[in-house]
Amino acid sequence: MSIGVVVFPGSNCDRDVRWAAQGCLNIPTRFLWHETRDLNGLDAVVLPGGFSYGDYLRCGAIARFAPVLESLVEFVARGGRVLGICNGFQVLTELGLLPGALTRNRSLHFICEDALLTVESNRTPWLMGHQRKDSLTLPIAHGEGRYQCSDETLCQLQDDDAIALRYVNNPNGSVADIAGITNKTGNVLGLMPHPERACDPVIGGVDGRGLLQSLLG
């Protein structure tokens, strides 16, 4: 079992993900610079939070053209598991691996707080260790985390059982309280909360461990 963590210019949560996976759970982890195309030997890839390429045009809009993501599309097509956290979720929507878009929070302010979540679906292998309606508390930290999509896309997400996580108190105005979604096959999960920041009781909680522990079967 081995995880790759993509590093874009402007990423700032890549080391947090590596620490959570390798430091807390002993899962071998290596960094993937945005220019690489080599995903050989990896069982899963994580797109971390941060501000890829400065997010100058739109969150994730430049990162979607990175060479590593060309290989990632092929990796997903082969059934490889991908986790997009915060900015990583934004990148996945820009890349077209997940539907919808992440826009400015309804308050127009950056939000940094713990969010109470409900597991809506455990169909994705990333949430196989949880039961539906489990409660999780995970940190959020974003200015553009408001999930939006068309009515048609929302119906499709519901039909595919692809809404993975919902906010209990919806801090950013996301449609249908959505905090995380999967692709149709379930091997790709994008979420705005930060599970890597909730893997050690010393810093306030372990509710994020389950997503990474799922890699261990």
From Swiss-Prot:
It is found in: Cytoplasm. It holds the Pfam family GATase_5. One of its GO terms (molecular function) is ATP binding. The keyword Magnesium does not apply. The active site is at 86 (nucleophile), 194, 196. GO terms for biological process: 'de novo' IMP biosynthetic process. Its EC number is 6.3.5.3, 3.5.1.2. Pathway: Purine metabolism; IMP biosynthesis via de novo pathway; 5-amino-1-(5-phospho-D-ribosyl)imidazole from N(2)-formyl-N(1)-(5-phospho-D-ribosyl)glycinamide: step 1/2. Gene3D superfamilies: 3.40.50.880. Keywords: ATP-binding, Cytoplasm, Glutamine amidotransferase, Hydrolase, Ligase, Nucleotide-binding, Purine biosynthesis. Part of the FGAM synthase complex composed of 1 PurL, 1 PurQ and 2 PurS subunits. This is Phosphoribosylformylglycinamidine synthase subunit PurQ. The gene is purQ.
